[in-house]
């Protein structure tokens, strides 16, 4: 069984507000947030940059592999069974912005948000981009596979073989989400 350890998201919080800025007029004046939770209990979130802003969702993945062989029946009428189970789950860990009084985002360049949640239950959300604003959905994958091989023997002579494979793949996408009391 192989499992990748979970990585914790960066967390920024402020009771009366959170402000992040990159105001200088040069090409490196960008803001990049990846798998980050930013919250303000009683205030606003303000993010400003002269250049581009990127809100990336990291893909966390869980993979398991199990192989099991066993025998059933009496010595003269044996059934040998081999099962291989495989499971893969990949889901995005997004940027979450949550402020009770509102969210203000301004960029002189582009804003690219991958599966980002903008949440301002008692306020408004203002997003301004100088060039372009793009909200992306990020793919989520759930994959299960069962491979089963059965052999039957009677007095040591093989007389039946069966091989079954069952595969289930479910792909969904986590979109960017904007929730506010007023827009």
Predicted regions, residues:
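Binding/recognition "hotspot" determinant
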Residues: 1-183
């Amino acid at each position: 069984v192989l499992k990748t350890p979970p990585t914790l998201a960066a967390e920024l919080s402020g009771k009366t507000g959170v402000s992040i800025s990159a105001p200088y007029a040069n090409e490196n004046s960008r803001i990049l947030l990846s798998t980050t939770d930013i919250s303000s209990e009683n205030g606003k979130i303000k993010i400003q940059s002269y250049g581009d802003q990127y809100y990336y969702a990291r893909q966390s993945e869980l993979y398991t592999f199990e192989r099991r062989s066993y025998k059933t029946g009496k010595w003269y009428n044996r059934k040998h069974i081999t099962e291989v189970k495989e499971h893969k789950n990949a889901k995005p860990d997004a940027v979450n912005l949550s402020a009770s009084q509102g969210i203000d985002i301004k960029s002189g360049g582009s804003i690219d948000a991958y599966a980002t949640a903008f949440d301002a239950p008692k306020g408004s959300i203002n997003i301004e981009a100088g060039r372009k604003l793009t909200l992306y959905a990020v793919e989520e994958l759930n994959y299960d596979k069962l491979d089963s091989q059965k052999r039957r023997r009677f007095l040591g002579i093989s007389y039946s073989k069966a091989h079954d494979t069952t595969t289930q793949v479910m792909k969904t996408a986590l979109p960017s989400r904007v929730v506010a009391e007023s827009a």
